[in-house]
């Protein structure tokens, strides 16, 4: 069973090793989807949505929302942001009944990246 929660955050960045308009400082309203894969526990839930919101807020949004992403990570492409989120969340959401399935980052309404476990290991 897949459980998913979505978040948004606003941030600025520039792509230093890219030649094009994204080389200049600019911002996005990013959308983040965190998806867990698992089975229901003794409370008949894969994961408590409130707990997932708290974890993502503490580990991800406090660092990325209204941030200059170049101060947080090197070359903050959508791909690198998704990998960064995965690494920050993986252990925090792991339970006997579930684990992180995917992290999806939308840079625009029509452009996104999805990271799976095999992309990180």
Predicted features along the sequence, with ranges:
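Charge-rich, low-complexity N-terminal segments
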Residues: 1-121
